[in-house]
């Protein structure tokens, strides 16, 4: 065909210029054979569909009957034509509200502006405290100065390792103010993963909370712990970090296909450009309260932590317990107006019960129709989309109520190009499916140390960007997501992924990373494939498929494959291997990346190109009937144990609802997490359980008792995993033989004299053994003396603790237990004066400390002609309240020749078990966790100007009586007392996280008959309560009770043992004061032969400690303080007791009030 000569140029529309041009220069599309029309149009239009649509009218309008048309590239002639052509690829409506210009500002500059506008406005409202903008500014500035001295400046990266806390906000802003960049870490991630991210990002420093200090130390030697002492509340000197918009702001890691997470940096310009547009869409302003829920490993957590401060709003941070508990209640408690949640998390909320929520942005995964239905009439509902590399939220559907779930909406701050999935240099017309490429100033820089992956994802500018004049709108990122523009509203519609990236529970992951990790446990030639299975009737599940060539012939799947021959029955060996692999993955991958099941496949299906046919594997697995799935599963393959109680039946129904599984697929011994459950499902299960009256089943309990049988046991009060133990055979605790020999020498005893050998005293016993003895005086006029001696002989034979002796050696006191003598002799002293005066004088003289092996317990009868008093000398190291009750009931029974109570467990056996329990790793771990990051609260109890006389033995006693109270439902009066004292302490000291001592009975060990042991089981142990100023009274009461319950199994461990093993406190730390809850009376009414025998106590010397007491009377409560005058001012005690009594009453009467409304 001859070349043609250009004769004229005609603009035909859409930027098309019809020309005559050499045939070899044109891209030809044959329309007619006989003649050729040549015309040019931009390369962006050069797709077959576009050419057909554009050339068809030209061919019909031609004077030639049989033209042939050739398309070539050309430049767009005019701005109008450019817009017209662009509209063929990006609908005009799609871009009309996008903010494409860069915001050339830094986060610290915008925060400073908001602070100057409203310095006293609330900035942070967290479970552990609140800050105004001024307070946040001052504290973060103070920390920023310290960071600058530690080398933090522009482009220096700092890792943040915090639980949900106000301190994470301070740390984040401090890094930004110092000029550095941060990466927010989730402490629940495996330490190996955290260490890998630290190394790959070349982070300089780890800022950690006190609770995570030890974990941080495993990752880096350069650790700074952030707590109240490091962020003083006073204003710091201004700091000019010199940050530029192009400097790094934060680092994020996402899942990587090579087996390691991919990290990248986001700069200030990118974040500000993205965030300000989203903030405007959400309507965030000074009255807004955004609640922070996302896990720290999720990029949305970074978005949550910064966005409110750019808009003058308040960030609300619930605790981990609140996040995993009643989420609806937490939203209401913090008065949240805005939230950014995954649809999965939003399903845990009850929309009709939310009182303040106004705007909900769903992000991280696709919502369902049911999600839209639940929320559409309740709040302003939006959907957000964006890969982390392109900005936190770059595309938003602002009217999700009226949309299909797949519509992701319109761009906020990017240009959404849709390209040929196989060639990103070619655009596809609006309405056709293609890969989404995002262009804008919101993009990350690229991946750490991965130039090839960076080049593949952050692509060079294609020619069509320049042709449309869009080269000034930033760089481009290939999302890997397939989308199209909707024909009706011109919004973007999400179709699916083009690669191996998937999302589960809002987290994006590379299937290749999971496969890489799993392959280590099934070495080649075995082949591992991991896929995300989705079905309408259940939550998405990550499932692994293992092909073992030795088990079957390797063959591609035939097209007509319609049965289940793809799968092999899971034998015992495969099940064992699979369970071992899944358990090992928990050490190297986050929970959301661990497959819920492994299936064994008979062959590896392939497509004609030789690649694995993943689609076929997914289809076959999803189509498996439940009974078929059970045969092939490595975790579901065991036989199902059926419920045997009504409680187990009820729990099975709850599981089926939460896991979206038929009840027939669940057995009472199945593991909740092996059936596809995760932390969110655990929260859902706990919430559903509360609705059915199982308030004790928390999400934490789901992790502790992951089977139905264990849960039922826990709810019944007896777990399958923890049974009461019999300590009588516990002989593992022994002293060194040389020490025993020395104690025998000092006590002048032989082993034959002892029924039980030497044991150390508990700290409380030792403290009381070093005090002067106390005396109990019992009126016994007319009581037969021989019967009296015989009765006490029986009582002392049974109760070995009153045959104890004490020996001091090198500052420690040890106890041993004498054999019972054949007879008991009670001496009688006669006097002429009133018997009580004589008894009092006798007690005053009988005050020697006995730490040389002589018995403490002694009895003397003092008579005159009319009256008689039995004086019993004893030490609190021998008894507690329960002991005296049992002791005197046995005494009355013995005197009247009745049968004594059953002897179940003797005190020495109990003590050996207790000593072993207190030193156990579980006890050490509990106290390390319970007290981590805390400090003992030491309120000022003396007047500053008061002079202290060490010789002053005077005591202070202050008490106030209040009517007996009925506490709120589900709360004990003890919990009210603890919470009220914590509140008074917090107000008095300014320390919201308070720790004080508490006297406990010490009978919480899982030991048979522990309640019948006679001896001193009492202990003085720490109690920690956090008084959040934003909490309600009920929140604090519940927290107080939860702390008490959590401590119960470990309350026998006392401060002297806890400090060196579980804290970083000074080893000489002692309690400033001790809480005591006492139920009067300590002794039962004593009567012998029907004759009442009144009793009274005689105390000597001075108590060394300050006690805060609540004593239960018949119809009243007595609240008071007591202590030595050299340690407790009467004035201060009076003030504190008044505040305490008032607080107890207000807490009891106004449980729904906010703590800020309580006046003291």
UniProtKB/Swiss-Prot annotation:
Q: Which GO terms describe its biological process?
A: amino acid activation for nonribosomal peptide biosynthetic process; bioluminescence; fumigaclavine C biosynthetic process; fumiquinazoline C biosynthetic process; nonribosomal peptide biosynthetic process; secondary metabolic process; secondary metabolite biosynthetic process
Q: Where in the cell is it found?
A: Cytoplasm
Recorded superkingdom: Eukaryota
Q: Which residues carry this modification: O-(pantetheine 4'-phosphoryl)serine?
A: 679
InterPro entries, sorted: AA_adenyl_dom, ACP-like_sf, AMP-bd_C_sf, AMP-dep_synth/lig_dom, ANL_N_sf, CAT-like_dom_sf, Condensatn, PP-bd_ACP
Q: Where is this region: Adenylation?
A: 132-520
Protein name per its UniProtKB record: Nonribosomal peptide synthetase fmqC
Q: What is known of its domains?
A: NRP synthetases are composed of discrete domains (adenylation (A), thiolation (T) or peptidyl carrier protein (PCP) and condensation (C) domains) which when grouped together are referred to as a single module. Each module is responsible for the recognition (via the A domain) and incorporation of a single amino acid into the growing peptide product. Thus, an NRP synthetase is generally composed of one or more modules and can terminate in a thioesterase domain (TE) that releases the newly synthesized peptide from the enzyme.
């Amino acid at each position: 065909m001859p070349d043609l000569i250009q004769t004229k140029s005609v603009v035909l529309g859409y930027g098309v210029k019809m020309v005559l041009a050499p045939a070899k220069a044109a891209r030809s599309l044959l329309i007619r054979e006989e003649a050729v029309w040549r015309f040019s149009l931009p390369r962006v239009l050069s797709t077959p569909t576009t050419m057909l649509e554009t050339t068809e009218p030209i061919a019909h309008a031609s004077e030639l009957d049989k033209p042939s048309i050739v398309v070539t590239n050309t430049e767009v002639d005019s701005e109008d034509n450019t817009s017209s052509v662009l509209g063929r690829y990006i609908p005009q409506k799609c871009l009309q509200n996008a903010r494409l210009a860069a915001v050339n500002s830094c986060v610290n500059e915008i925060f400073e502006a908001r602070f100057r506008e409203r310095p006293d406005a609330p900035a942070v409202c967290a479970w552990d405290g609140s800050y105004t903008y001024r307070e946040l500014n001052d504290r973060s500035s103070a920390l920023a100065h310290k960071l600058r001295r530690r080398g933090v400046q522009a482009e220096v990266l700092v890792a943040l390792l915090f639980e949900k806390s106000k301190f994470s906000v301070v740390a984040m802003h401090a890094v930004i103010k110092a000029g550095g960049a941060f990466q927010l870490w989730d402490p629940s991630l495996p330490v190996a993963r955290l260490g890998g991210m630290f190394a790959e990002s070349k982070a300089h420093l780890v800022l950690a909370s006190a609770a995570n200090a030890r974990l941080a130390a495993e990752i880096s030697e350069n650790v700074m712990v952030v707590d109240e002492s490091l962020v003083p509340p006073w204003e710091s000197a201004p700091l000019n970090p010199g940050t530029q918009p192009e400097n790094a702001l934060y680092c994020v890691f996402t899942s990587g296909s090579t087996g390691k997470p991919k990290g990248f940096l986001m700069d200030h310009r990118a974040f500000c450009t993205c965030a300000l547009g989203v903030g405007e869409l959400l309507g965030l302003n000074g009255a807004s309260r955004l609640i922070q829920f996302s896990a720290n490993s999720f990029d949305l957590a970074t978005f949550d932590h910064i966005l409110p401060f750019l808009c003058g709003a308040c960030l609300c941070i619930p605790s981990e317990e609140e996040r995993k508990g009643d989420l609806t209640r937490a939203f209401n408690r913090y008065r949240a107006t805005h939230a950014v949640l995954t649809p999965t998390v939003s399903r845990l909320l009850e929309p009709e019960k939310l009182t303040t929520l106004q705007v909900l942005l769903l992000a991280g995964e696709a919502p369902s129709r049911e999600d839209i239905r639940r929320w559409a009439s309740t709040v302003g509902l939006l959907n957000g989309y964006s890969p982390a590399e392109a900005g936190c939220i770059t595309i938003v559907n602002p009217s999700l109520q009226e949309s299909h779930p797949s519509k992701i909406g319109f761009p906020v701050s990017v240009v959404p190009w849709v390209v040929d999935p196989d060639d990103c240099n070619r655009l596809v017309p609006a309405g056709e499916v293609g890969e989404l490429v995002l262009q804008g100033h919101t993009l990350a820089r690229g991946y750490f140390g991965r130039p090839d992956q960076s080049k593949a994802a952050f692509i060079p500018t294609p020619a069509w960007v320049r042709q449309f004049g869009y080269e000034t709108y930033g760089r481009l990122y290939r999302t890997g997501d397939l989308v199209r523009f909707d024909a009706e509203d011109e919004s973007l519609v999400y179709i699916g992924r083009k690669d191996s990236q998937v999302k589960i529970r809002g987290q994006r992951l590379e299937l290749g990373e999971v496969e890489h990790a799993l392959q280590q446990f099934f070495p080649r030639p075995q082949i591992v494939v991991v896929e995300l299975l989705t079905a309408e009737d259940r939550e998405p599940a990550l499932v692994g498929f293992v092909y073992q060539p030795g088990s079957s012939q390797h063959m591609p799947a035939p097209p007509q494959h319609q049965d289940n021959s793809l799968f092999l029955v899971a034998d015992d060996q495969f099940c064992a291997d699979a369970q071992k692999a899944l358990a090992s993955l928990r050490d190297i991958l986050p929970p959301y990346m661990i497959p819920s099941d492994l299936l064994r496949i008979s062959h590896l299906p392939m497509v004609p190109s030789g690649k694995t046919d993943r689609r076929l594997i997914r289809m076959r697995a999803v189509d498996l009937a439940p009974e078929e799935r059970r045969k092939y599963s490595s975790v579901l393959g065991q036989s199902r144990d059926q419920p045997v109680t009504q409680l187990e039946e009820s729990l099975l129904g709850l599981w089926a609802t939460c896991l979206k599984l038929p009840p027939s697929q669940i057995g009472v011994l199945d593991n909740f997490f092996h059936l596809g459950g995760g932390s969110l499902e655990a929260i859902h299960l706990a919430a559903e359980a509360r609705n059915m009256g199982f308030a004790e089943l928390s999400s934490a309990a789901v992790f502790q008792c992951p089977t139905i049988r264990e849960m039922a046991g826990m709810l019944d009060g007896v777990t399958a995993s923890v049974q009461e133990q019999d300590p009588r055979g516990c002989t593992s605790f022994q002293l060194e033989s040389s020490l025993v020999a020395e104690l025998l020498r000092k006590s002048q005893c032989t082993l034959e004299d002892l029924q039980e050998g030497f044991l150390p005293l508990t700290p409380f016993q030792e403290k009381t053994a070093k005090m002067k003895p106390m005396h109990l005086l019992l009126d016994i006029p007319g009581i037969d003396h021989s019967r009296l001696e015989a009765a006490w002989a029986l009582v002392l034979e049974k109760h070995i603790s009153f045959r104890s002796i004490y020996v001091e050696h090198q500052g420690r006191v040890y106890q041993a237990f004498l054999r019972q003598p054949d007879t008991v002799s009670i001496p009688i002293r006669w006097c002429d004066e009133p018997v009580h005066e004589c008894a009092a004088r006798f007690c005053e003289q009988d005050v020697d400390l006995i730490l040389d092996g002589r018995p403490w317990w002694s009895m003397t009868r003092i008579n005159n002609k009319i009256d008689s008093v039995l004086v019993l000398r004893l030490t609190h190291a021998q008894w507690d309240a329960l002991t005296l009750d049992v002791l005197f009931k046995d005494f009355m029974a013995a005197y009247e020749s009745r049968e004594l109570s059953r002897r179940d467990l003797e005190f020495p056996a109990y003590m050996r078990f207790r000593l072993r329990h207190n030193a156990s790793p579980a006890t050490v771990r509990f106290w390390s966790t319970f007290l981590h990051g805390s400090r003992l609260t030491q309120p000022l109890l003396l007047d500053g100007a008061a002079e202290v006389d060490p010789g002053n033995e005077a005591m202070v006693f202050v008490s106030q009586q209040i009517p007996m109270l009925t506490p709120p439902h589900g709360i004990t009066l003890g919990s009210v007392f603890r919470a009220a004292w914590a509140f008074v302490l917090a107000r008095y000291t300014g320390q919201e996280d308070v720790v004080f001592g508490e006297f406990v009975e010490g009978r919480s060990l899982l030991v048979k008959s522990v309640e019948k042991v006679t001896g001193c089981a009492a202990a003085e142990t720490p109690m920690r309560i956090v008084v959040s100023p934003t909490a309600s009274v009920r929140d604090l009461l519940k927290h107080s009770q939860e702390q008490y319950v959590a401590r119960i199994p470990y309350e026998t461990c006392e401060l002297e043992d806890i400090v060196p093993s579980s804290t970083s406190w000074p080893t000489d730390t002692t309690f400033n004061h001790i809480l005591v809850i006492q139920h009067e009376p300590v002794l039962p009414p004593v009567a012998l032969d029907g004759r009442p025998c009144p009793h009274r106590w005689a105390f000597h010397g001075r108590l060394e400690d300050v006690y805060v007491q609540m004593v239960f009377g018949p119809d009243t409560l007595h609240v008071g303080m007591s202590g030595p005058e050299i340690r407790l001012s009467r004035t201060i005690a009076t003030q504190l007791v008044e505040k305490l009594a008032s607080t107890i009453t207000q807490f009891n009467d106004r449980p729904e009030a906010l703590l800020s409304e309580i006046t003291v």
